[in-house]
């Protein structure tokens, strides 16, 4: 750590503020920034700020895609975790940069909650070395967990390169036949209660699972409460 990075632990600062705190010239400041790989610059003109990257488990950048109404995924942004803890810089596909003190607002609905969220948390806790209590997960824990989430996303968001690759290579699921629903639903309900299957990030406390099944009006993705 250096004096520069120590100052940035509290959050983004402008060049004039940093130069004043460090009592250095513009030339010296430029050299300091050039030597610090984790110091990033964002904004334009007088709105330019400097921030300190905060890699999480070796990850500095988390790409995000948005799935449109036609089922096509489009690159939306890159998220870079920064200091202070929980904050991030989001660079849109159009180059627009925005600072967030927590999860970007459009991803907050993806935070695990309710019955399925707890089941998902228990399933991933041992794998990711996280606490089983999803209420104790920090912002970076949630983002990291979302990169390995293999269910269906609320709002059509794909977080992480791995999920994008799974999306574009996924095969269309086979619908549960009408005459086999009872057997399949009993097993899915049992698995859901055991925390072994999570097909959605839907919230709520009532036990439930999601699946793709035949219905009188055609094959549909359904949310089954029991």
Model-inferred region functions:
Residues 2, 8-226:
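Phosphate/dinucleotide-binding and metal-coordinating scaffold of catalytic cores
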